[in-house]
């Protein structure tokens, strides 16, 4: 009797609107799955067009080209004798749906629309799609003529149904549906579905993998069954990095784990599992069986096909494994580095240009490029021909093979220390030493002539000469003189990014990298249109605390001792005059708060969704052992005053890798006004009234003691 099934899931590095490339990656994944004996192949959400099409979903071209790719898949001999489950947008009765299209041997078995759409954080699915709200119901979908000619079908089932093969029952849920309070797999499992599939478009956030794995294992622990999860991987066109983690689970255990970060465009997981293990597991869960007797049945699409074969007694089954998680520092070293690689190769540029200041943030960005070079070299050594072809295109040398990460880094990364009269020798030395250790092409230059020319122009026109505060100038003069240095550096960065390879006789341009962290962006502790303005920023969604942990990891993993002195030095912008040759300005003094405090404010503001008064109330409890109510009030007022004053800077912020749940990214993750009443009169008055009450109560208690 046939009872062992081999199933496949995958993680694909799809690219929004790259229909040709997406088709080839889908076909390759199906080919690998068949070669490994799989009879069912699951792919990521919206894999045909790529998940991140955004407003291109409105365009009829996106629907048309998706249908054309589906036709090519139906027609390909690669897709024969295996059930293929692919994702694409489908219009049904003039309504757009996010769908799974499941087919076998040129016949479409079912079009299953997504029932719960992701619409929080970075997700905006309700903007483009409508959820299918008719649970356990199907309609006829009239196929376009291009598909009718191929399938010889006029209509196919469209809606919430399951597949019934000769040997088992298969049900689909799509990404967000796994995260809902009452996921479809619950009732499907009670109705006898044994194999659950989940096609995801789930992006990376630090520390998120645990939640994803826990949801899958818990689903199969409570109800039994096989669970396949597919996901997109890589950068498909914007700030998000989809982090793979395809998996196969059964009865609460993991049987196959895909990589979370990888340069492989196609990764296929297969597992051979025994259906009888599901049936025996479910048999002794009496609560599940009682609930199953009352569940409403799903429409079943009968499939003349089996996932198992008759002679499978000698077929070895897969063994359970322990899921291996990355630490947050490891996630940072891998995720943004893979994102940089995708951005570099797909933008068809020749490398990166990074202003290297000698501080932690720009050092972390340099280390991410170095980590990228490590991953490229490892992929080439493993025989990844796609990565080798891409790196040869980037360096413009068809016979090139990278020898080691340092040698490759010298070809793709140009670093530049832009000194001013306010720069210290220590930061200059630290930047140079790090550049030597990672192998980047390093440039040192002085910006003073340009700064003096600009300030001189202002003085010539106005007759006024601004001075730094230490020389008797006002706060306005002091800030303006700092900002002109920062903005000059941005202009110089773009000039050198465009022409530095030209000056060396090499073709191509460089992508300018920014290095402002998420905490500084939240507070607005950066100059608008300075070195925070770049083409992309790989650390813009990462906290200072996590960045320091990542840099410490690089000291050990990549043997970069220069990072030790960078970690030990106080963070400074070096925009004000030195005191006796030493740094007189530190970031935390300028901000009026520590980076640790900023992370707390950020999480409370975005994740806990607190305004000034609610944040004050929460911090009263959190900081009761270290701060008085008056101190807490002053800190909260300081944060919200500076945050609202600088909120306008977020509207022009460089696109940054999304990694943190409290990111202030203005693109679509954190939508706020950028013109505030920065005095917050009503909110601050509520805080002040509460402080006065608490102080009065404390005085009464002290008087009572006396």
Curated annotation (Swiss-Prot):
Catalytic reaction(s) noted: deamido-NAD(+) + L-glutamine + ATP + H2O = L-glutamate + AMP + diphosphate + NAD(+) + H(+)
EC number: 6.3.5.1
Record-linked Gene3D superfamilies: Carbon-nitrogen hydrolase, HUPs
Coiled-coil ranges (or none): none
Highest taxon above the source species: Eukaryota
Active site annotation, chain numbering: 45 (proton acceptor), 114 (for glutaminase activity), 175 (nucleophile), 357
Subunit architecture: Homohexamer.
Family per similarity comment: In the C-terminal section; belongs to the NAD synthetase family.
Function: Catalyzes the ATP-dependent amidation of deamido-NAD to form NAD. Uses L-glutamine as a nitrogen source.
Protein name: Glutamine-dependent NAD(+) synthetase
Organism expressing this protein natively: Bos taurus
């Amino acid at each position: 009797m046939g009872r062992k099934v081999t199933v496949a899931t995958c993680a694909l590095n799809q690219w929004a609107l790259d229909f040709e490339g997406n088709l080839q990656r889908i076909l390759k994944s199906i080919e690998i799955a068949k070669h490994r004996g799989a009879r069912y192949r699951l792919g990521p959400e919206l894999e045909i067009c790529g998940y991140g099409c955004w407003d291109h979903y409105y365009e009829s071209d996106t629907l048309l080209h998706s249908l054309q790719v589906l036709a090519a898949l139906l027609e390909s001999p690669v897709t024969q004798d295996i059930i293929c489950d692919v994702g694409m947008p489908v219009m049904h009765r003039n309504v757009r749906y996010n769908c799974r299209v499941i087919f076998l041997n040129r016949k479409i078995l079912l079009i299953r629309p997504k029932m719960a759409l992701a619409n929080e954080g970075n997700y905006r699915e309700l903007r483009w799609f409508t959820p299918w709200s008719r649970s356990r119901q199907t309609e006829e979908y009239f196929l376009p003529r291009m598909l009718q000619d191929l399938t010889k079908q006029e209509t196919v089932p469209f809606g919430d149904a399951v597949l019934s093969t000769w040997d088992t029952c298969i049900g689909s849920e799509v990404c967000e549906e796994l995260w809902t309070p009452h996921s479809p797999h619950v009732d499907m499992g009670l109705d006898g579905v044994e194999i659950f599939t989940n096609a995801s478009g789930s992006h990376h956030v630090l520390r998120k993998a645990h939640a994803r794995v826990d949801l899958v294992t818990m689903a199969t622990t409570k109800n039994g069954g096989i669970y396949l999860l597919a996901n997109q991987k890589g950068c498909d066109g914007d700030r998000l990095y989809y982090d793979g983690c395809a998996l196969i689970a059964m009865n609460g255990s993991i049987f196959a784990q895909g990589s979370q970060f990888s340069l492989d465009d196609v990764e296929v997981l297969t597992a051979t599992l025994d259906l009888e293990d599901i049936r025996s597991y479910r048999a002794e869960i009496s609560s599940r069986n009682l609930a199953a007797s009352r569940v409403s049945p799903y429409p079943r699409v009968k499939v003349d096909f089996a996932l198992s074969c008759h002679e499978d007694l000698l077929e070895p089954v897969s063994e359970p494994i322990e899921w291996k998680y990355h630490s947050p520092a490891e996630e940072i070293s891998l995720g943004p580095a893979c994102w940089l690689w995708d951005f570099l190769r797909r933008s068809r540029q020749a490398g990166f240009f990074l202003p290297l200041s000698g501080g932690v943030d720009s050092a972390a960005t340099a280390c991410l490029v170095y980590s990228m070079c490590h991953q490229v070299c490892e992929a080439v050594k493993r025989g990844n021909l796609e990565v080798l072809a891409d790196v040869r295109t980037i360096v413009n040398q068809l016979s090139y093979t990278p020898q080691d990460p340092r040698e490759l880094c010298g070809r793709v990364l140009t670093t530049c220390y832009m000194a001013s009269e306010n720069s210290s020798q220590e930061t200059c030395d630290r930047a140079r030493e790090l550049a030597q250790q990672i192998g980047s092409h390093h440039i040192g230059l002085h910006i003073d002539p340009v700064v003096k020319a600009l300030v001189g122009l202002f003085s010539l026109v106005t007759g006024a000469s601004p001075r730094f505060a230490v020389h008797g100038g006002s706060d306005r003069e002091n800030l303006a003189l700092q900002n002109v240095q920062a903005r000059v550096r941005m202009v110089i960065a773009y000039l050198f990014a465009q022409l530095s390879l030209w000056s060396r006789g090499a073709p191509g341009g460089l992508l300018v990298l920014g290095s402002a962290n998420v905490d500084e962006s939240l507070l607005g502790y950066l100059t608008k249109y300075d070195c925070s303005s770049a083409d992309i920023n790989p650390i813009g969604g990462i906290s200072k605390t996590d960045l320091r942990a990542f840099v410490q990891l690089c000291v050990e993993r990549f043997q970069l001792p220069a990072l030790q002195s960078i970690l030990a030095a106080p963070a400074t912008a070096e925009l004000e005059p030195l005191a006796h040759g030493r740094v007189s300005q530190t970031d935390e003094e300028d901000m009026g708060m520590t980076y640790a405090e900023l992370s707390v404010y950020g999480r409370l503001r975005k994740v806990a969704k607190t305004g000034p008064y609610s944040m004050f109330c929460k911090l009263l409890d959190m900081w009761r052992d270290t701060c008085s109510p008056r101190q807490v009030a002053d800190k909260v007022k300081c944060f919200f005053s500076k945050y609202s004053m600088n909120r306008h800077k977020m509207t022009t912020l460089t696109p940054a890798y999304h990694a943190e749940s409290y990111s202030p990214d203005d693109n679509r993750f954190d939508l706020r006004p950028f013109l505030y009443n920065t005095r917050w009169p009503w909110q601050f008055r509520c805080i002040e009234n509460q402080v006065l009450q608490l102080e009065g109560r404390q005085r009464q208690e002290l008087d009572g003691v006396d």
